[in-house]
């Protein structure tokens, strides 16, 4: 898989990091989105991504840093499982969903999306203590604050969550030539509908999944 970064200290985010942070999800997702993953390497990258995901979602890095690492800086100084240091990072999860959609991995895309949606099965509001209608940046996984939220009202997860649903899963993408419709629907979705205002026109789009059982 792809490493996180290079610094004056060497490589950051690869198998050699004994303190934590052996793998980061963003380099894998964005390598796919940027079309730079060779065909022979794709299975390894996808395996790395899928191996990071938990029942609550996907962390930014895995495993968390156990102690401060001057090569990494701020995030390694956080408690393991808090925010960027191994917390369930929904903003990064959105990038992963878009990568799944690009590869037509419908089950994986929707599976992660359902974990990101507020007040879901894995993140009920009674546990997270946040409003049931608000996207959150991350869920904390340190035992002392398990599944508490971080930055629920100031996060790119909101915009990216909508992008994942409309442009990724439903496949409604704006182009210069017009509106392109290329959905990535799981087999369990028999039908779905959406509304979109595009170039001054209100469109109602209904999907029927002929692959559905």
PLM features per residue range, with description:
Residues 1-90, 121-145:
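Extended glycan-interaction surfaces of carbohydrate-active proteins
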Residues 51-55, 66, 78-84, 95-213:
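Non-catalytic C-terminal accessory modules of carbohydrate-active enzymes
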């Amino acid at each position: 898989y792809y490493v996180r970064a290079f610094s004056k200290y060497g490589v950051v985010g690869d198998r050699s990091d004994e303190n934590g942070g052996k793998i980061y999800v963003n380099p894998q997702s964005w390598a796919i989105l940027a079309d730079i993953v060779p065909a022979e390497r794709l299975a390894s990258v996808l395996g790395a991504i899928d191996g990071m995901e938990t029942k609550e979602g996907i962390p930014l890095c895995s495993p968390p840093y156990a102690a401060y690492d001057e090569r990494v800086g701020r995030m390694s100084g956080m408690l393991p499982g808090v925010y960027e240091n191994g917390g369930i990072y929904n903003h990064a999860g959105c990038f992963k969903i878009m990568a799944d959609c690009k590869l037509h991995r419908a089950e994986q895309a929707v599976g992660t999306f359902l974990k990101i949606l507020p007040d879901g099965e894995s993140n009920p509001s009674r546990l997270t203590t946040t409003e049931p209608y608000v996207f959150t940046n991350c869920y904390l996984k340190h035992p002392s604050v398990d599944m508490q939220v971080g930055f629920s009202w100031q996060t790119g997860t909101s915009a990216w969550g909508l992008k994942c649903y409309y442009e990724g899963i439903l496949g409604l993408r704006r182009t210069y030539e017009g509106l392109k419709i290329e959905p990535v629907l799981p087999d369990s979705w028999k039908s779905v509908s959406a509304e979109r205002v595009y170039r001054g026109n209100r469109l109602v789009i209904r999907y029927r999944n002929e692959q559905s059982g």
